[in-house]
Amino acid sequence: HGVVRHVGTQYMADVSRDALVVSVREGQVEIDGRFHQGRAREGQQVTLSGSQQPSILSIDRSGREWAWVARRTPAADVDGKTLHEFLVWACRETGLRLQFEGNAEAVARDTVLRGRIDAEPAEALRLRLATTALKWRIEEGVIHITDETR
């Protein structure tokens, strides 16, 4: 069906006898098909099927179909790094967007982490945040971090 080249990304490709399906979580993927060429961007799923025009759908960046990423992600070595750095890592690995509210970003940048948690990113996120003064919730693919002390 074609050649797929990623450009600094997280993506998955599924090839069957009838189609090539490329889903992009982060970054972009160049697709060079037999009949069509193009680029799939973050949050898109492109399907090439023979000489038909490519089909482009919007997709979520997190969820069941991306669970394999978390299973393959090594534990983050965050000893001596900030909570902010950890949150950026965890969001990338889970496909969530990060949104700070109130003074939470300053707290995250000032909080230095110690130790290591050998867990998948979502579980590491839950365990790390349980030890901080920050509250968090996930809504529609966004993790909202708020300062509990306010």
Q: What are these model-derived regions, one by one?
A:
Residues 1-150:
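A residue-level detector for the "anchor" residue at the start of short, highly conserved motifs
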